[in-house]
């Protein structure tokens, strides 16, 4: 076996086990190919003889029934999921996906196309259509398809808020805000605290004139009685008598001046 020369091809080839190479090649190509390979050789079987053979029980299928094809229905848009009937009445919103629905509520004045898409149940009400034009008895359809004269009359009937705004602006300009720290401005725009004058009626004036002819000065008891009869206060009776005496004095003075001249 000991040779001084290089190892020849015949010697190397004799050391390689060609039988094992054929078995490994057959196993590799049988795993990659679609067709099962033939029975393996018994050269590798003794290595796994100590292990018992594994047997698995067949598992029940997950889905007992077979899959049925879904029914296709005409739709406008994409359906992310199927409709759930138990949520149709209790949910706050109606269908949130695009789907043609029969018996939809059309707009007033527009032809209904039998479709409505994801609207709230209270989106349309019966009395909303006549809110703006309900006073004139016309609907939106009459307003859209009517002539220009009727539209002009409708605009003329609507009151314009501009005069009210102008009047309120003038009213604000006439009453400027007063500065509480400026005494001059407060004095100029000061209001009198005197009460509004309450004139006497003809009946009250006549009765007071009669009482003045009898007595120019009233006692307290008589003043109380006159005030009670004429439905006046004692202060009103007192002031009237004071003014009447001043008027009488002035008239007497004018008479004396006229006589001297």
UniProtKB/Swiss-Prot annotation:
GO terms for molecular function: DNA-binding transcription factor activity, RNA polymerase II-specific; RNA polymerase II cis-regulatory region sequence-specific DNA binding. It holds the Pfam family Hox9_act. Keywords: Developmental protein, DNA-binding, Homeobox, Nucleus, Transcription, Transcription regulation. It is found in: Nucleus. Gene3D superfamilies: Homeodomain-like. GO terms for biological process: anterior/posterior pattern specification; DNA-templated transcription; embryonic skeletal system morphogenesis; proximal/distal pattern formation. The keyword Transcription regulation applies. Residues 156-182 are annotated as: Disordered. Residues 193-252 bind DNA. One of its GO terms (cellular component) is nucleus. Belongs to the Abd-B homeobox family. Sequence-specific transcription factor which is part of a developmental regulatory system that provides cells with specific positional identities on the anterior-posterior axis. This is Homeobox protein Hox-C9a. It comes from Takifugu rubripes. The gene is hoxc9a.
